């Protein structure tokens, strides 16, 4: 009986030591916050781990290491991109991924052109170029994109040259008669950084279409800020 008890105790002790060693092996020195070492997101059947680069001597290289770009067009963007639109930092982006993207209540949008997106993006992002939101509201591509945001074209929506002209002139009847935003998803848009106007233009385009400002978020630091903090960047397949 004593031998069995000692044997069981020894097994438990060994298991405890192995668990501690295993935890130490995977412990990170460079965490996101004191309480969060990483965040995981699944996209297209693949799981991505958002964490910071662990090499503490790592330095930014390439285009995002630059401090100066010709302005215009690469001018500093305001902290508040539009009234009612919240501006997010990195922790809020990760929280949005965890709480909104994972539950299909929100979409993280890489608003850059496809060539930029192909070079690397934030895990969990969907590429919708800012140019899409400048299309005519009757354009099939825009209508399909809006459907992905759970925004449907109203069955009674008017269309045609005269309707589009009134919209351009700002004399179209409000509230928006064309789109139904009652079930619209929350959107968090980003681009290359605080000097990039792609996501601000996307947000302005969405607002012009009637998208509720309270459902739009802006990650101003964008890819440059994300890389400065050594956070995970994925290359789309």
Predicted feature descriptions by range:
Residues 107-110, 125-129, 186-190, 216-218:
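Structural recognition of the beta-strand scaffold that forms the well-ordered cores
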Residues 146-223:
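Catalytic cysteine-centered active loop of the rhodanese-like fold, especially the PTP/DSP P-loop
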Residues 113-117, 132-135, 193-197, 222-226:
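Solvent-exposed loop/turn segments at secondary-structure junctions
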Residues 1-13:
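Bacterial N-terminal signal peptides that target proteins for export
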Residues 229-237:
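Active-site neighborhoods of enzymes that stabilize oxyanions during catalysis
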């Amino acid at each position: 009986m004593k031998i069995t008890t000692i044997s069981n105790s020894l097994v438990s002790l060994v298991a405890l030591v192995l668990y501690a060693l295993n935890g130490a092996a995977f412990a990170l020195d460079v965490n996101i916050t004191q309480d969060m070492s990483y965040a995981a997101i699944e996209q297209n059947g693949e799981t991505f781990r958002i964490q910071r680069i662990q090499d503490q001597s790592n330095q930014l290289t390439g285009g995002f290491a630059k401090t100066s770009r010709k302005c215009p067009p690469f001018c500093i963007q305001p902290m508040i991109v539009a009234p009612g639109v919240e501006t997010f930092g990195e922790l809020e982006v990760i929280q949005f991924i965890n709480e909104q993207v994972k539950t299909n209540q929100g979409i993280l949008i890489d608003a850059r052109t496809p060539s930029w997106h192909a070079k690397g993006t934030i895990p969990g992002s969907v590429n919708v170029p800012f140019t899409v939101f400048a299309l005519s509201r009757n354009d099939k591509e825009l209508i399909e994109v809006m459907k992905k945001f759970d925004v449907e074209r109203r069955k009674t929506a008017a269309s045609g040259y005269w309707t589009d002209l009134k919209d351009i002139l700002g004399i179209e009847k409000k509230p928006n008669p064309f789109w139904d935003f009652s079930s619209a998803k929350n959107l968090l848009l980003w681009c290359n950084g605080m000097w990039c106007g792609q996501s601000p233009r996307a947000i302005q385009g969405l607002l012009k279409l009637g998208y509720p400002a309270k459902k739009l978020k802006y990650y101003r630091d964008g890819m440059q800020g994300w890389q400065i903090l050594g956070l995970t960047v994925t290359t789309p397949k």
